[in-house]
């Protein structure tokens, strides 16, 4: 029941692996014909929150793209709202690095100093790195820090990114590959600025 109107939510999709099923809303107002709203136009995983007067559908904000938001209520129906930009948690600093066990690299980028370092250091290259590190991947604590890897789902071997956080020096290191380019890009670009632990990660990647 939302705003005094009985509703049913469900998922609808065409199948295949391009996009998952998307939510819809079926309203069943008393004394009126049922009304169908949606499915929502999104390829991303959508969650729903029930509020007294509305249903709020949303996708997770990612470094590569903002979170999408849709709101349904009995008065205005289903409408897209302003997106939610990805942002670091200002309360999360290097002291929270131990919490990144088994965390996707997107979670690591919620550490305020990590996101700030990447956005500032990568500059115009940040969108390419963010796109790859936000997709299919995983991460975990490793000796010396945190290591996360991700890649674009359909071009995983050619479009990928690696994020390494050095715990002892509190420094951030990034490696990413763009399809069609000769080799991976590094940040910092000068290998002499890489710590021994970060260089070990880089050498492992270069030998794969």
PLM features per residue range, with description:
Residues 1-13, 112-132:
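N-terminal, post-signal-peptide region of Sec/Tat-exported proteins
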Residues 3-20, 25, 51-64, 145-150:
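Short beta-strand elements that form the blades of beta-propeller/WD-repeat-like
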Residues 30-125, 159-208:
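Acidic, small-residue rich beta-repeat scaffolds with periodic aromatic anchors
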Residues 1, 47-48, 134-139:
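Short amphipathic beta-strand and strand-loop transition segments with alternating hydrophobic
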Residues 121-170:
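Intrinsically disordered, low-complexity segments enriched in Gly and acidic/Ser/Thr residues
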Residues 24-27, 140:
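N-terminal start-of-domain structural block
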Residues 17, 33-34, 153-157:
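Short, structured surface segments that line ligand/substrate-binding pockets
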């Amino acid at each position: 029941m939302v705003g005094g109107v009985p509703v049913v939510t469900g998922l609808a999709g065409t199948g295949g692996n391009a996009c998952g099923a998307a939510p819809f809303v079926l309203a069943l107002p008393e004394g009126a014909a049922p009304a169908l709203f949606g499915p929502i136009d999104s390829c991303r995983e959508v969650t729903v929150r029930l509020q007294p007067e509305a249903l709020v559908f949303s996708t997770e904000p990612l470094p590569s793209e903002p979170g999408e938001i849709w709101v349904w209520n009995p008065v205005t129906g289903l409408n897209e709202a302003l997106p939610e930009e990805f942002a670091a948690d200002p309360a999360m600093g290097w002291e929270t690095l131990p919490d990144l066990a088994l965390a996707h690299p997107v979670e690591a980028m919620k550490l305020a100093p990590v996101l700030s370092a990447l956005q500032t250091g990568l500059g115009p290259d940040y969108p390419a790195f963010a796109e790859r590190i936000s997709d299919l991947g995983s991460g975990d604590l490793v000796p010396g820090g945190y290591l996360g890897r991700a890649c674009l789902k359909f071009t995983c071997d050619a479009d990928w990114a690696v994020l390494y956080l050095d715990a002892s020096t509190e420094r951030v290191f990034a490696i990413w590959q763009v399809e069609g380019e000769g080799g991976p890009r590094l940040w910092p670009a000068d290998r002499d600025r890489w710590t021994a632990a970060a260089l070990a990660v880089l050498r492992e990647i270069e030998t794969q």
